[in-house]
């Protein structure tokens, strides 16, 4: 289902632990990492889609998480043409997403990447809140930055991205 501008309605999910680190999933048989996300079915609310995708991709139920916040508006990204299925070329532009920020209230061991027969991830880790912006595939970078920035206001004690970058160092310990 595409909107009239060629964007597929979708939800993005940012799961935080008590240290404000975010769940970062490694895509099956790939070397790329991303947040859980997925399409909204016709007649489904963004919140219902988020809970369905949360179970399908991460194996977490509503009782394992608490919604902390969500983006006010749809955030969009365009998918490069060479990534678009041939039958969708010409009509499909990308995804429009409502992003949810969740707090994991369960345990790390509640995460189950094999909750369905078609897993999206084959590995995961906790990552610094701002780190995904630098490590996600380039065409999603801007939407990740918009989502993380908008939702950061819900987290106490989280450094701004600028403050986080100011203290960043290279692998050899030299300032960036």
Curated annotation (Swiss-Prot):
Pfam families: NUDIX
Cofactor: a divalent metal cation
Keyword entries, A-Z: Hydrolase
Top-level EC class: hydrolase
Keyword Nucleus assigned: no
GO molecular function list: pyrophosphatase activity
Nudix hydrolase domain ranges (all copies): 6-149
This protein's name: RNA pyrophosphohydrolase
Organism of provenance: Laribacter hongkongensis (strain HLHK9)
Gene: rppH
């Amino acid at each position: 289902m595409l909107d009239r501008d060629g964007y597929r309605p979708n939800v993005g999910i940012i799961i935080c632990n008590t240290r404000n680190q975010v769940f970062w999933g490694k895509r099956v048989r790939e070397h790329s990492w991303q947040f859980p996300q997925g399409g909204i079915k016709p007649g489904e609310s963004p919140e219902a889609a988020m809970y369905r995708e949360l179970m399908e991709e991460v194996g977490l139920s509503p009782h394992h998480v608490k919604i902390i916040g969500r983006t006010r508006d749809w955030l969009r990204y365009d998918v490069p043409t060479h990534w678009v299925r041939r039958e969708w070329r010409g009509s499909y532009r990308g995804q429009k997403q409502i992003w949810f920020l969740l707090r994991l209230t369960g345990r790390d061991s509640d995460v189950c990447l094999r909750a369905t027969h078609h897993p999206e991830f084959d590995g995961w880790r906790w990552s610094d809140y701002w780190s995904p912006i630098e490590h996600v595939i380039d065409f999603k970078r801007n939407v990740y930055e918009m989502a993380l920035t908008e939702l950061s206001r819900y987290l106490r004690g989280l450094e701004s991205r600028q403050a986080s970058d100011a203290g960043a160092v290279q692998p050899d310990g030299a300032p960036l």
